[in-house]
């Protein structure tokens, strides 16, 4: 059974908060970024990210689940056709909240919430760097036993050469 959210609602009632989040999410998916108050942006972030996760899966069931929350079919089509496939290789973190200066009239804290459009180049570069370091360590580990065998062979040769010297001395 669904439980009501704790704490104050945005805009008053639960139904108004649901309508507010629906409209904010539709605007976010339509425009890519929106400017709103900071509490609304913080409330919108998990709501929008769950919808994007549904869009990434792309099944008919997921489309119907999103249509329950976003009644605008054009926005849902854009979400499933463009936004979902764009984030297919990203595991969460589809949105970014940037704080901006307070609103002039009532000094309300404002923020810009936007879809992250950059590919995760840094994580791919870090992953490639880690793989290269691991392969270099493996190559060094294979070279060390070969070098130790050579060292042992030279010490054996020294031992053999020193033994005949001892035999000559006796």
From Swiss-Prot:
Protein origin, superkingdom: Bacteria
> MF terms per GO, please?
structural constituent of ribosome
Q: What is this protein called?
A: Large ribosomal subunit protein bL17
Q: Which SUPFAM superfamilies match?
A: Prokaryotic ribosomal protein L17 (SSF64263)
Q: Name one GO cellular component term.
A: cytosolic large ribosomal subunit
Where is the region Disordered?
A: 134-170
Keywords, comma-separated and alphabetical:
Ribonucleoprotein, Ribosomal protein
GO BP term, pick one: translation
Matching Pfam families:
Ribosomal_L17
Give the classification, highest ranks.
Bacteria, Bacillati, Actinomycetota, Actinomycetes, Mycobacteriales
Tell me which InterPro entries the record gives. Answer: Ribosomal_bL17 (IPR000456), Ribosomal_bL17_CS (IPR047859), Ribosomal_bL17_sf (IPR036373)
Write out the similarity annotation. Answer: Belongs to the bacterial ribosomal protein bL17 family.
Q: How does it assemble?
A: Part of the 50S ribosomal subunit. Contacts protein L32.
List the biased-composition ranges (Low complexity): 134-144
């Amino acid at each position: 059974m669904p439980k009501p959210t704790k704490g104050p609602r945005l805009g008053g009632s639960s139904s108004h908060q649901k309508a507010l989040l629906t409209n904010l999410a539709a605007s976010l998916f339509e425009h890519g970024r929106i400017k709103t108050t900071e509490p609304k942006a913080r409330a919108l972030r998990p709501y929008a990210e769950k919808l994007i996760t549904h869009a990434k899966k792309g099944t008919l069931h997921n489309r119907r689940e999103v249509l329950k929350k976003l009644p605008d079919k054009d926005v849902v089509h854009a979400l499933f056709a463009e936004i979902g496939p764009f984030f297919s290789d990203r595991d969460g973190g589809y949105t970014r909240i940037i704080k901006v200066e307070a609103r002039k009239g009532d000094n309300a804290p404002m923020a810009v919430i936007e879809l992250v459009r950059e590919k995760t180049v840094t994580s791919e570069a870090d992953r490639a760097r880690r793989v290269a370091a691991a392969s270099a360590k493996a190559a060094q580990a294979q070279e060390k036993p070969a070098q130790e065998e050579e060292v042992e062979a030279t010490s054996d040769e020294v031992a053999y050469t020193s033994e005949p010297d001892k035999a000559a001395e006796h």
